[in-house]
Amino acid sequence: QGECAVASVYHLPIMDGSIDFLLNCFSPLAIDEFRRVLKQGGHFAYVVPAAEHLWQMKEVLYDEPYPNEVKRTPYEGFRYVDVLEVRDTITLDNPEDIFALFQMTPYSWKTPAEGVARLKSLTTLTTDIAFHIHLFEKE
């Protein structure tokens, strides 16, 4: 049986050493807090964008699109278990969905106005989605 909680990643409302598995998806990594709440031998999955995530959207937004940084970082007190790459292609077929996806990304904070205007002019967008799921075990 599982339970879910939505909270600040830096102040989880969870007792020390009480969690078997923790999922962190596109959120800041609060490694000290994860170390605190995970049981010995517990795992956490860290989901981050792969290099080409939303590449075709970035081609619309930027004159020179850039790949996302990909790294495998060791964390003290955790053993790196594995990484899984998940890829697919999605098609958004209306401007509202395209802009909603854009607003869920950090690109919405740093894209030049010209790029936003190009994106808003689209009626359809087909783009790659690509994630890395890193798995760690608390030592």
Regions found by a protein language model. Name each.
Residues 41-53:
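Conserved beta-strand signature within the Rossmann-like core of class I S-adenosyl-L-methionine
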Residues 1-13:
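Conserved SAM-binding strand-loop segment of SAM-dependent methyltransferases
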Residues 26-40:
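A short, conserved alpha-helix within the catalytic core of class I
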Residues 51, 58-80, 86-139:
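Conserved Class I S-adenosyl-L-methionine
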Residues 3, 79-82:
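Conserved beta-strand segments of alpha/beta enzyme cores
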Residues 14-17, 54-60:
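Short, charged, surface-exposed secondary-structure boundary motifs
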Residues 10-22:
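A short acidic, Gly/Pro-enriched loop at the edge of an enzyme's catalytic core
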